[in-house]
Regions:
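N-terminal presequence-like segments and the immediate start of the first folded domain
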Residues: 1-74, 80-136
Length: 136
């Protein structure tokens, strides 16, 4: 998928995301429900960075099941229950990101919420991808 990256100079240079991703006309939209990082059957929920990595894996499972690749992701909203934990784990989160997405950064938002529906969930990731468009 080849997105046209849209980063107006008046908004400053983004770090770790892009302000806009213009999809090619020949792609198909894939809307991915919020994915959490809990492991089914685990006695204890994993920590923040482990949940983030697992949530990313689940997102990519859906993308790949639709015939896509990581760079097809055009938008991502990350919901966290503890912004301080996110900030404290930024190095580990960056490593998890690069292992899965490399240097592909979609348009992103990070939102702190009081809680998530799944008990023990610290992170939930909602995503939109464009599948089947023109690729380099």
């Amino acid at each position: 998928m080849t997105f046209e990256i849209v980063n107006p100079a008046s908004l400053g240079e983004p770090r770790g995301w892009n302000n806009g991703m213009l999809a090619p006309a020949d792609g198909r939209l894939l809307f991915i429900a919020g994915q959490v990082g809990l492991e089914p059957g685990a006695a204890e929920p994993p920590g923040f960075s482990a949940q983030f990595a697992t949530a990313l894996d689940r997102v990519l499972t859906v993308v790949r099941s639709a015939g896509g690749i990581p760079s097809d992701v055009g938008r991502m909203t990350v919901y966290v229950t503890d912004l301080a934990a996110y900030r404290a784990d930024r190095v580990a989160l960056g490593q998890a990101w690069k292992a899965r997405f490399g240097t592909h950064y979609p348009a992103m938002a990070l939102v702190e919420v009081k809680s998530l529906v799944d008990r023990g969930a610290l992170v939930e990731i909602e995503t939109t991808a464009v599948i089947g468009g023109t690729r380099p």
